[in-house]
């Protein structure tokens, strides 16, 4: 008897018995087919419909319902669960996990007008709809819409707080310093200084060819208080300020990078050859031919370049009313066991006579000991300075620098970085943090854009990594937006110079997505600049890459791939080794080819029509595979009780990878959601395969927001998700601001504004993340929509409180240079805005959103037609200059 019980238990655990469910449609469902995965379709039944094997026709049936009986069903948790595919001839196909069918939470798909219920549940579609909607549940996005607009202050209270090591350098030159204080968020016992060549730590014979680092200290030590405050010069320049309060002694430090033997100026910064910077930037994969070029460049690199030095000055001040001691420690190499000498007469620290690594002074004289205690009277100060060389120098070079004034180097550095900002467009918004992040962000990007001056390719690095076609794109496009067209062009040239002979652009770690992404950025550059001369110069390389993509696509035009990747290229798009027909990969390839077709048409080049036609056909094939993939992908529940169709990240998939329909282990980079949420089908909207307003685009957005976001922000590396681009395009202000502030507050250092790559603090100074934040800011302020310029579409409402002003001076767009301003005089009942655009590519229409801070509707509108729902003034036709005035 006990064996019978065991057998019965085993059989029950794998659900081998038949299960019947009923599908009920709202209206005419038409014809279709039923297939079952991991189970067997035993029977289809209908009242008045026509059934033939696995096909059905409910066109003439009075009741639009279908009973399905599935045998050998697998309804236990885990992979290989039974999935029912309802394949409609009207493209409203869907699939569902059989185990998800229940009466309490019925599968109700309003987009397709259908519900799925267990046998015995006799509710009609209308009754199910009423039962679900009467519960008045909300999706995550609907909840956001009911809440106040998100602000940085609100977001900062609920998300991770990040402290990021700061990078200091010159820009163009790969010699940089990483500086880190002993904070509560790290495990340092004192301050750390790490010289780097781009993303690679400097190694020395004295460090046993391991990454060299130095430690120094001020104050009595690490205590119970979190007493370090950090900032940038004027809130924006890459000059690091650190203030520590140790009871009555206040230590204020200023640290920056400079040249040791020359004035810091753009003329004196030689820069580093992009091939050499790539050698020191992890991820770069050189072809055999490129390795030969690299070896030649390394052999010929200049050995007499100016030394790069880290300049630091700490002023210790007694702010108490009795005498107090201040403590100082000069930079020491390694963990205390490295061999070196300190010269008490000069304040030099050296590995040997001709290997000086640091010059230290106190009150402008050589420091007499490596560690000091100085008694300060109330109000008295002591200055502790040091110059740390990027790599050790001769005694003579150290002596030369010892006589240099710190203050003169400080003035040079400020002037150097300010001159760069002066060449850029100016943006001012009524939120100081955002103002600072725009300016500091541009300089952070510039700091690790490497290359020789004054001309030639620039490597737009992304943190420690070499340039990547996708990740460098927002960097180059923000350069374009801020008027740094030359930097953008030189950064694009990098990818063309590293193009392989067959046209493939694939520099980073086997990423196959770069070719399309680079072509897209070239197309964007042309939209901004109409630089016909340069485009004609690089046209052979452009065509070579386009033809490479087309040949690659043609190799995938196989009958067995119809609907599952036909005409779609295959390969990985990021670190995971997912070499499939990925939607992201093909989206970028299509967008790149489409942009080049547009460029060629403008230049009257004969291949224009061919490339446009190829791009259009590629788009059709991608859409066909997407529709098939979605039909086979299980629906998922949303927060409002409805269910939504989903899509896999690649054409051969059967659903979101995170649902684990199949056996496998895919967790990576701190999350289960990479393939779906960060690299998945939402890119088809971003890459213009789908229009944002399409129903299918909205479905993708809806289930992504429920499954793959926390606080409306992605996991691990949230700036890889394109949903905030979608929210901006759709004018979803509250969701946009929720993502904008939540992601920024959780990813960026709140004092120095540098970004981590990942939320688990992997790789600092990640400029791909920072550039995406900057481009989000740009889109918040202005963006193009075909022949229309949209201004302030998703700005915070409180930016137009009384007395506040928004100003965009000389920003760049597809329509040329823009001058935009808005001034709120709510106390006088007025908001006024000005828009100017004087170019031969002006927009036909301008839409400017001016939301009243208290949601009021204007009583009078001057300067255009008013769209009350969108709080937007529409100016059409636009003649180059408009003044809009709202009276409340």
Q: How would you name each of these model-derived features?
A:
Residues 1-20:
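Bacterial Sec-dependent N-terminal signal peptides
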Residues 19-429, 788-888:
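Terminal accessory carbohydrate-recognition/targeting modules of carbohydrate-active enzymes
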Residues 143, 244-247, 380, 393-396, ...:
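Low-complexity, Ser/Thr/Pro/Gly-enriched N-terminal "stalk/linker" regions
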Residues 261, 303-305, 309, 368-406, ...:
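The feature captures the catalytic groove of carbohydrate-active enzymes
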Residues 422-444, 469-470, 500, 513, ...:
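Active-site acid/base region of carbohydrate-active enzymes
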Residues 451-454, 497-508, 565-582, 660, ...:
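Acidic/His metal-coordination segments adjacent to aromatic residues that form catalytic metal sites
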Residues 466-484, 489-502, 515, 540-543, ...:
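Active-site core of glycosidic bond-cleaving carbohydrate-active enzymes
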């Amino acid at each position: 008897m006990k064996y019978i019980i065991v057998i019965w238990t085993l059989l029950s655990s794998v659900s081998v018995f038949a299960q019947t469910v009923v599908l009920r449609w709202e209206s005419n469902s038409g014809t279709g087919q039923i297939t079952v995965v991991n189970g067997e379709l035993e029977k289809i039944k209908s009242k008045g419909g026509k059934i033939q094997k696995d096909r059905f026709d409910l066109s003439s049936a009075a009741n639009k319902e279908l009973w399905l009986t599935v045998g050998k069903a697998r309804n236990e948790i885990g992979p290989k669960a039974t999935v029912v595919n309802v394949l409609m001839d009207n493209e409203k196909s869907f699939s569902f996990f059989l185990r998800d069918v229940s009466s309490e939470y019925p599968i109700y798909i309003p987009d397709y007008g259908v519900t799925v219920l267990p046998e015995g549940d006799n509710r009609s579609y209308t009754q199910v709809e009423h039962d679900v909607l009467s519960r008045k549940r909300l999706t995550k996005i609907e909840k956001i819409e009911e809440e106040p607009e998100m602000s940085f202050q609100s977001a900062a209270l609920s998300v991770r707080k990040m402290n990021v090591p700061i990078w200091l350098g010159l820009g163009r030159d790969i010699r940089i310093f990483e500086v880190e204080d002993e904070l509560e968020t790290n495990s340092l016992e004192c301050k750390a200084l790490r010289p780097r060549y781009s993303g690679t730590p400097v190694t020395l014979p004295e460090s046993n060819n391991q990454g060299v680092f130095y430690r120094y200290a001020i104050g009595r030590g690490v205590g119970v208080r979190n007493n370090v405050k950090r900032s940038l010069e004027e809130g924006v320049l890459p000059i690091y300020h650190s203030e520590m309060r140790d009871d009555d002694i206040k230590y204020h430090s200023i640290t920056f990078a400079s040249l040791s033997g020359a004035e810091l100026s753009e003329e004196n910064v030689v820069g580093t050859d992009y091939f050499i910077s790539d050698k020191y930037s992890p991820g770069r994969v050189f072809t055999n031919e490129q390795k030969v070029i690299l070896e030649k460049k390394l052999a010929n690199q200049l050995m007499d370049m100016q030394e790069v030095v880290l300049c630091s000055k700490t002023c210790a001040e007694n702010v108490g009313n009795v005498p107090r001691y201040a403590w100082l420690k000069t930079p020491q190499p390694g963990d205390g066991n490295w061999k070196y000498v300190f010269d008490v007469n000069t304040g030099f620290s050296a590995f040997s006579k001709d290997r000086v690594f640091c010059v230290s002074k106190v009150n402008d004289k050589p420091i007499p000991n490596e560690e000091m205690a100085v008694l300060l009277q109330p109000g008295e100060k002591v200055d502790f300075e040091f110059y740390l060389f990027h790599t050790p120098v001769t005694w003579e070079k150290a002596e030369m620098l010892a006589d240099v004034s710190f203050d003169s180097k400080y003035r040079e550095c400020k002037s150097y970085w300010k001159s760069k900002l002066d060449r850029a467009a100016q943006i001012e918004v009524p939120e100081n943090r955002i103002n600072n992040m725009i300016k500091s962000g541009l300089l952070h990007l510039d700091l690790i854009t490497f290359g020789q001056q004054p001309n030639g390719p620039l490597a737009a690095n992304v943190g420690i990594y070499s340039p990547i076609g996708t990740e460098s794109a927002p960097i180059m496009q923000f350069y374009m937006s801020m008027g740094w067209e030359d930097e953008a062009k030189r950064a694009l040239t990098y990818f063309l110079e590293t193009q392989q002979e067959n046209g493939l652009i694939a520099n980073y770690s086997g990423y196959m997505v770069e070719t399309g992404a680079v072509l897209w950025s070239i197309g964007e550059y042309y939209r901004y600049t109409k630089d016909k001369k340069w485009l004609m110069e690089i046209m052979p390389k452009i065509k070579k890459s386009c033809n490479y993509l087309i040949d690659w696509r043609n190799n995938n035009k196989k009958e067995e791939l119809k609907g599952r990747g036909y005409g779609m290229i295959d390969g990985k798009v990021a670190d995971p080794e997912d070499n499939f027909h990925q939607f992201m990969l093909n989206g970028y390839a299509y967008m790149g080819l489409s942009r080049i077709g547009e460029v060629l048409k403008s230049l009257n080049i004969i291949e224009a029509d061919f490339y446009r036609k190829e791009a259009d056909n590629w788009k059709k094939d991608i859409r066909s595979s997407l529709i098939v993939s979605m039909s086979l992908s299980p629906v998922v529940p949303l927060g409002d009780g409805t269910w939504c169709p989903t899509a896999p990240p690649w054409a051969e998939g059967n659903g979101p990878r995170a649902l684990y329909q199949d056996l496998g282990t895919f967790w990576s980079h701190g999350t289960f959601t990479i393939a779906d949420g960060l690299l998945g089908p939402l890119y088809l909207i971003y890459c213009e395969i789908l229009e944002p307003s399409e129903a299918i685009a909205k479905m993708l957005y809806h289930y992504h927001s429920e499954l793959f976001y926390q606080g409306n922000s992605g996991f691990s590396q949230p700036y890889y998700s394109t949903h905030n681009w979608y929210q901006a395009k759709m004018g979803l202000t509250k969701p946009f601001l929720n993502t904008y502030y939540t992601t920024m507050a959780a990813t960026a250092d709140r004092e120095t504004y540098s970004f981590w790559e990942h939320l688990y603090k992997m790789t600092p100074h990640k400029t791909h993340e920072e550039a995406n934040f900057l481009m989000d800011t740009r889109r918040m302020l202005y963006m193009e929509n075909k022949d229309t310029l949209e201004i302030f579409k998703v700005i915070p409402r409180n930016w137009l409180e009384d007395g506040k002003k928004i100003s965009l001076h000389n920003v760049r767009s597809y329509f040329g240079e823009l001058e935009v301003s808005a001034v709120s005089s709510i106390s006088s009942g007025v908001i006024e805005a000005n828009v100017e655009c004087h170019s031969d590519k002006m927009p036909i229409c301008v839409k400017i959103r001016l939301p009243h801070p208290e949601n009021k509707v204007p009583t009078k509108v001057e300067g255009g037609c008013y769209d009350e729902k969108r709080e937007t003034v529409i100016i059409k036709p636009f003649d180059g200059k408009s003044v809009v005035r709202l009276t409340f």
